[in-house]
Amino acid sequence: MHYLMKLFFSLSLFFGINGAVGSNQPSQANKNPKLFVFGNSYADTGNMKPTALSWKLPYGITFPGKPSGRYSDGLTATDFLAKQLGAKLPYLWRTHGKKKVKLNRGMNFAFGGSEVFDSPVDRSPNISTQVGFLVNLALARRVYTIDGDLASSYALLSYSGTDYYGFIDQNPNMAAYPAFVEFIVEDIQYSLGIMNGLKFKNIAVTSLHPLGCLPRVTVASSFRSCNESYSDLVRLHNESLKKAVAKLNKEDKFRTKGDRFVIVDLHKAFMTILEKKGNKRFKSPLKPCCEGDCARMDMKGAKKYTLCNDPKSAFFWDEINPTQEGWRSIYSLLGKSLTESLTK
C-alpha cells in the first residue's frame, strides 16, 4: 500500500508539473545560479527552532562567533558547495518559506535530525516532505518558475544515515540489512525523481559516509578505531544508491546530453581524511572537539561537555558533525571534479 500511494503521488505530480511548465519562459543562461538544499544537519544552515542545540553555545564559535543554527563550530557543507558553484547562500525555509514574492536565491529546506522516515523523537520534516515544500513554492505559489529558475539551478540532497542508527541497534543480524537498505534508497530515489520533474540543471546526492567512524560510535574505543560492523550496511547503501542514480540518469526524459544526477562521494572523502591521506592531517581525527553532551548543561548549570583548545585541529565537531575545518577539508578533496560534474 505504501508503495502504491507513493507511485500514485509520483505520477500525479509528474503530469501536474508537465502541464504547468508550458507557461514558463525558456531557460536562461546560468549567470546567477541558485542552490536548493534538502537533508539534515550536514546541510542545515539554520532551519531548526531557536530551542535546538544548534542555536546554543559552543555551536558557531568559529563562525560567526555565536550560534547560527549550524551543527558545527562554523560553516557546513552547504556553505562550501555554494561557494564552489558561485551561488549565493540559499535562503532558509524557516525565514523565507512563507513569502509570496519571487526570490533571487535558492532555498535551504534541510533540518537537523531529518530522516527518510518520520522520527518518533525529532519533529524535523523528513526529506520527501522537504521536497514537497519546494513543489508547493514552484507549482502552487509560483515563487520559483520551473523552466526559468529551477532549470538553471542546482540541488543537493544530503543524507547522513540517521535512520540506520536505531535499526542497527535493534537488528544485529546482517540478514535484515538488505531489505531495510532497499527501503531507504527507494525513498531517496523517489525524492530524486520528484526533483527531476522540477527540471533542475543538476542534482547532487551524497553517498553514505562511514557510520562506524563517527564519534558517537568510536567513543567505545576511546576514539582510537572505527567499528567495522557498520561497514557492510554502508557498502550496501552506497551500492544501491549508485544503481538508483544510474537508473534515474538512464530514464531521464528531460536531459538529452550528460547526466543530471551526480553522487557526492562523502564516503571516499571521509576515509581519505580519517586515514590521514589528505592534504590536511588531523592528529586525532576520530575524536570530536566538543566531547560529551555538546551544548547541554546539567541542573546546576555546569557544562556536560568539554571543548578542545582549537577547533581547527579537529575533524569532528560533535558526535556526528564535522568542524568547519573538517568540511573545508572534505570539499577541498571533492573540489574541481565535483564542480565540473555539476556545472557541465
UniProtKB/Swiss-Prot annotation:
One of its GO terms (molecular function) is hydrolase activity, acting on ester bonds. One of its GO terms (biological process) is lipid catabolic process. It is an enzyme of class 3 (hydrolase). Glycans are attached at N126, N227, N238. Its EC number is 3.1.1.-. The keyword Transmembrane helix does not apply. The active site is at S41, D318. Its main location: secreted. Keywords: Glycoprotein, Hydrolase, Lipid degradation, Lipid metabolism, Secreted, Signal. GO terms for cellular component: extracellular region. It comes from the Eukaryota. Residues 1-19 form the signal peptide. It is found in: Secreted. InterPro entries: GDSL, SGNH_hydro_sf. PANTHER family: GDSL ESTERASE_LIPASE, OSJNBB0059K02.9 PROTEIN. Belongs to the 'GDSL' lipolytic enzyme family. This is GDSL esterase/lipase At5g03590.
